[in-house]
Amino acid sequence: MKVEFPEFGTAVSGFSYQERELPGGIRVEWKCVRSMENEILLLHGGDERHLPFGRAEVDLLGYDYTALGHIHKPDLEMKGKCRYSGSLEPTDPNDIGKHGYVIGTIEHGVVETEFVPAARREYLNLDIRVDQEMTGRRLLEKLR
C-alpha cells in the first residue's frame, strides 16, 4: 500500500503479511516505484521468522528512508536511511536500555535522524547484596 502526501512531496509505502510469520524475506515487487521526491518505507520484521533481511537488501529497494519495526530495542548505531526506533516503552524485563522514538528529516535526498528518549519507565539490572539479617524495609531503602 502506498499513501501520497503531495503537500510534503512524500509518499509512504508499507507491506503487510497475512500470516503470523513470514520467513521468506524481502520481495522484489516491493522495490520503490518513485512518485514523489521523498519515498519512505515502513517495514516490520528482521528476525529469522518475521521477514528476515539485512541492511543491504533494504538499501537495494531504493527508498529514501526505511522505518523498521519488530525489534523493541532502538538501534542507536544504525543511522542514515534505515533505522529501528524500538518501542516507546519497555515491554518486558529483557527490554533494558533507552526507549523512545526517531524523528527525522529528508531534504534533497539527505536523511537526518535523531533518537529521542521518551519512556516513562525502565527496567534495570541491579546487584544488591542481601543477607539473613536484611528486612523488607531495608531492602526497599537500598532500592531507592
Each PLM stretch: what is its role?
Residues M1-R83, S87-G100, T105:
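His/Asp/Glu-rich metal-coordinating catalytic cores
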Residues K2-P6, S85-R144:
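Binuclear metal-dependent phosphoesterase catalytic core
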